[in-house]
Amino acid sequence: MFLKKLKLTNFKCLSNIELSFEKTKTENRKWTLILGENGTGKSNILKSIALVTSGSNALGELLGNTDSWIKFNEKSCSIQAELETKKGEERNISLQFNRGDNLSKIISNNRESLHLIDDAIENADRNYFVVAYGASRRLSNEVFSNFEKSRNGRSINVRNLFDSASTLNPLTAWIIELDYRSGKEGINLVKEALKDFLPGITFHSIDKEKKQVLFETVDGIIPLDQLSDGYQNMAAWIGDLLFRITETFKDYKKPLEARGLLLIDEVDLHLHPKWQRRLLDFIGTKLLNFQVVATTHSPLTAQQADSGELFALKRSDNNIVELVPFQGSPKSLLVNQLLMTPVFGLETDESYEVQQAKEEYEALKSKGDSLSSSDKEKMKEVKRKLKTKLPKRKAPSSSDKEIALLQKIETKLNIKK
């Protein structure tokens, strides 16, 4: 299944949002990144996708208070989506919630769309496979506590997006279970999945007696639970995701090549900038046939998006949230250039203190001859501050290696001419 189009009407704070996931008329986009200030509804877009693809049983477990999904002062809300099956067939599905409706009324009113999902799931539970993660991605303290509980229920695959208190299946549990079930073949899958998993560490082995997964680091062989918080946060959802894929597609020789939809809120949470720059490539390489819809606040992550993959939620002058596509390719911009595009909305790449000092100076300067003596003293003070605080910009320079590479490319181009 691939998601082709999404339309939201009065869903939470989103009055009227339309988003196409088509790269071309014949090809769907693999990546969609959504930016936006807090409170503009980034997470709500992910939740709407999870709800409309959930099916009857899961919907009842995820929905909670029906009225909470409807925009304030509105009587109803709707989610409309267009999907494409593995066979290339189009499916139009939708959900509508009316204020005051209970769960049975909602299921009755949306019977036709839910029937499409339910039939597909009944045929094979892995049809329309969707996994979702919220911004709070916590590991269980007990290695196998949630591991056994999570074997049933389609809603479990997206629960973390809706419930910040929900915990994930530990990476340790997945690896030990896979080793027990599949032996050497399982360990090879682990090695392949975790290759380039995190910078500076590699999977080493399993300590079966202590029920620990060991990683090789610059500081020696260290168990997963002793790695940094950033590594463990990444391990939390990556481990849970790998578990769900291999459990669902356990009859596949290469389960990581299965098709599916991954929804993840704040995809780069707690990650060092070096790893943020590699994250999209890692996910795309490991999950070749997954479609990914993610939110981010990071310009480093946004910079990895290709043309047509980056969008921003912005509030208009009349406080309506609008979806703004990024014009051009983020990959072609420097990070500071990207920060000052409309999708991020920064006016300068200088510090807030310097920006304030400049504005104060311009305000004083605009007074012209009407400057008071105290204004003149203030102006001198602001000038001194700017002189010491204003960053010095250097002309961009290239290293000897970069110059040599450019010369080599130029030589090859001349030969081709």
Regions found by a protein language model. Give the residues of each.
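Pre-Walker A-like glycine/lysine-rich segment at the N-terminus of P-loop NTPase domains
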Residues: 1-50, 284
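RecA-like P-loop NTPase motor core
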Residues: 2, 284-285, 300-417
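Phosphate-binding glycine-rich loops of NTP-binding sites
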Residues: 27-67, 229-243
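Conserved P-loop NTP-binding catalytic core
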Residues: 46-104
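Extended helical coiled-coil dimerization/tether regions that scaffold
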Residues: 86, 154-257
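Coupling/switch segment of ABC-type P-loop NTPase heads
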Residues: 95-198, 342-343, 356-362
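Walker B catalytic acidic pair
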Residues: 265-266
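Conserved H-loop
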Residues: 296-297
